[in-house]
Amino acid sequence: MAGKKAPNGLFAARKLRRKRLKFRWSQREFKIKMLGLKKKHDPLEGAPMARGIVLEKVGVEARQPNSAVRKCVRVQLAKNGKVVTAFVPFDGGINYIDEHDEVIIEGIGGPRGRSMGDIPGVRYKVIMVNGVSLKALYLGKKQKPVR
């Protein structure tokens, strides 16, 4: 008759918890979380938003079965100099953004911090241009300041 694999009893909780923790290190998601690998890899370095300078406007083709050119901008982040692609929301939103404008970007909201919908490789979206909300510019509530 083989021995028991796990202790049982009133005072076995600590031992059970430690044993479970040992096995959790073999799970990919747990290891990434505990070692902070996502934060090390993330261009925003774990922050919810980041400021950057627009380098150029680019059109990204939508994935199948859709057919469109999604308007995006290449942004160089101020905090670390990394260059990322950010989606510009709203109909004609790209017209409010010029090269060398200062923009604030945030995550686009895809699953697990990845890209969303039919825009391949784009994980961020523009929310502010030169200190003014892109939505306010689009709705005509505010004017873009001249820099």
From Swiss-Prot:
Record-linked Gene3D superfamilies: Nucleic acid-binding proteins (2.40.50.140)
GO BP annotations, alphabetical order: translation
InterPro entries to which the protein is assigned, alphabetical: NA-bd_OB-fold, Ribosomal_uS12, Ribosomal_uS12_arc, Ribosomal_uS12_euk/arc
Cleavable signal peptide: none
Top-level taxonomic group: Archaea
GO molecular function, one term: structural constituent of ribosome
Pfam families recorded: Ribosom_S12_S23
Single GO cellular component term: small ribosomal subunit
Keyword list, A-Z: Ribonucleoprotein, Ribosomal protein, RNA-binding, rRNA-binding
Binding partners and assembly: Part of the 30S ribosomal subunit.
Family: Belongs to the universal ribosomal protein uS12 family.
Function: With S4 and S5 plays an important role in translational accuracy. Located at the interface of the 30S and 50S subunits.
Protein name as annotated: Small ribosomal subunit protein uS12
Species: Staphylothermus marinus (strain ATCC 43588 / DSM 3639 / JCM 9404 / F1)
Gene transcribed to yield this protein: rps12
